[in-house]
């Protein structure tokens, strides 16, 4: 009496034990955060073409670089990247809501099918827009593959892409009248 079947207490102990703490990577040293030669090459081409005042470069990790540009230059810079560097398609378009800054950042992850030497590289092209009147020029005329992704960003974050062929609903119900669901102030009803 009072004894548990063999093995049961072991499984209960395993269920109730806390999960292991996540490990964090140490911060990058200055040397580790510098861009490798290939990334430096295409970054220098972009900066020399448009100037340091129009582009902010953030090296992320090998094969991945992020540049942030003012939205008024995004079409011109995206076209240069496509025509001169060989990044020929938008692999995805993502967005992040920054309510404290009253901004939404939209990031195009650019890749290449046509140039084998950069096929593994991803160039993230980012820009920001005012959250209250979230409008950006479309990049569908530069990267046809951005069409679907911009539609999703329009619907989920409320960013209107000027010149886009179809800024309309396709995932949410047509009568959706609430905030875009990926905005940080969106609340699920009843919670």
Language-model-detected regions and their locations in the chain:
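Conserved helix-adjacent loop modules within structured domains
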Residues: 1-191
């Amino acid at each position: 009496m009072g004894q548990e079947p063999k093995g049961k207490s072991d499984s209960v102990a395993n269920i109730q034990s806390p999960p292991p703490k996540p490990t964090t990577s140490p911060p990058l040293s200055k040397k580790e955060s510098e861009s490798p030669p290939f990334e430096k090459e295409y970054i220098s081409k972009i900066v020399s073409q448009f100037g340091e005042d129009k582009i902010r470069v953030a090296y992320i990790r090998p094969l991945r670089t992020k540049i942030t540009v003012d939205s008024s230059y995004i079409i011109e810079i995206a076209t240069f990247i496509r025509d001169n560097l060989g990044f020929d398609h938008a692999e995805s378009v993502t967005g992040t809501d920054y309510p404290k800054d009253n901004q939404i950042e939209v990031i195009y992850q650019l890749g290449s099918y046509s140039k084998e030497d950069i096929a593994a590289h991803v160039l993230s092209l980012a820009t920001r827009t005012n959250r209250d009147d979230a409008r950006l020029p479309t990049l569908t005329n530069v990267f046809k593959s951005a069409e679907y992704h911009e539609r999703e960003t329009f619907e989920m974050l409320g960013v209107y892409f000027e010149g886009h062929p179809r800024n309309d609903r396709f995932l949410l119900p047509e009568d959706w009248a609430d905030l875009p669901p990926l905005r940080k102030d969106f609340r699920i009803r009843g919670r």
